[in-house]
A protein has these predicted regions:
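Glycosyltransferase catalytic domains, chiefly GT-A lineage
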Residues: 1-166
């Protein structure tokens, strides 16, 4: 209703119960009904890597539910869209993310290893290239230097390729 010129699809992806969750993470039925009433498709996905231990990682896993090879925008459930998204000038060939990341980073402690060690350990755990993820325009150990996936939104040309990479 708020985006009459939008020709895309709205897909709500939700994790399903499994051994990576202590409880039931599914979307409430009334929420699914509201989304459906607005034309959204609600699709389930299995949490294979993250689940309850790192809920923010589930947004990466949810990308596997989206149509491969089609441009996508991911919005967190708490993202407020205030205009018609059909009128946004978007270049899907260049992956992008919101930059509202402050206030969610680890607090420095007396003997902590530092941002580089923390983030590199995560990339190493999943066999990803850490060096290519760094924003070298930012100083070493400054929080904005490190790619972060708790963005309110992110977009790209292919959700399958994005999911496979991360």
């Amino acid at each position: 209703a708020g985006a009459p010129d939008f020709a895309g699809r709205m897909i709500g992806a939700g994790p399903q119960p499994g051994d990576r969750w202590n409880g039931d993470p599914r979307m409430a039925d009334d929420i699914k009904e509201v989304l459906g009433g607005m034309g959204a498709e609600v699709v389930p996905f299995e949490s294979r890597h993250f689940g309850q231990s790192y809920p923010y990682g589930n947004k990466i896993e949810g990308l596997a539910t989206l149509p491969a090879g089609e441009p996508f925008i991911f919005f967190d459930t708490d993202t407020i869209v205030t205009g018609d998204i059909a009128n946004m000038p978007i270049d899907f060939s260049r992956p992008a993310a919101s930059m509202k990341r402050e206030g969610t980073w680890p607090e420095e402690e007396l003997y902590w290893p530092g941002y580089t060690a923390i983030w590199k350990s995560l990339y190493d755990k999943f066999g990803l290239d850490f060096e290519s993820s760094l924003d070298l325009s930012q100083p070493d150990e400054y929080w904005e230097r490190y790619l972060y996936f708790n963005a309110g939104w992110f977009l790209g040309a292919d959700p399958g390729a994005f999911h496979a990479k991360f």
